[in-house]
Amino acid sequence: LDSISDIQTLITCTGLDDFVNHRFHIDKIFKVTHPKEYIRKVLNEHRSLKLEGFPTFTGGLVGYFSFDYFKYSEPSIIKNQKDNGFNDVDLMLFDKVICFDHFKQKLILIVNIGTNDLQKNYKKGIKELDELDYIIRKHVKTLVQPLKLLEDFKPVLSKEEYCQMVEKGIDYIKEGDIFQVVLSNRLYAKATGSLFDSYRVLRTTNPSPYMFYFASDNIEVAGASPE
């Protein structure tokens, strides 16, 4: 999957209780104990067929669950939370997909339609496919400001704090509480521009089976599997 088109619905979870469902404007804000029930409801309402020759993803929810999402399953370990700029959940519902198969060098345009009025929706789907085809053939380039760091990266944890985590992890392993632990130390820096060009360079110089670029109103995320 290399591209998706036209958001139908945006689902955002901003805190332990607040859940927002909006389509270009806020439709509703409500409280949830765990977001997964509402997300599962949306998925059940937007099922699509798996067709031979099509990619595994032909439409649905795209986005991220932040690290802090774990608190909905284990609220007892929430403490000293720091705002890292991410919502707990940001998911966008898409019914149109522009899929580029890098291996086959093949472009696939996909439009999902509802079955409530099949003939009417089919004609609408054909029109939307023609519109996607027109957009691609126009070759309109979007200027993207390259990423520029305004300062050096700084770690969230000091060397002493990180070493303490390592020692604590070793103790937990010795005591039999855990058998493996993956520690990390997030780096941060002020920057301007977009991650998109950085993602394109990464995709060219270090192609990986798992790569991603995601952008919403206030967040950009890009990455690749290390192997």
Go through the PLM ranges and name each one.
Residues L1-E227:
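Extended alpha-helical targeting/anchoring segments
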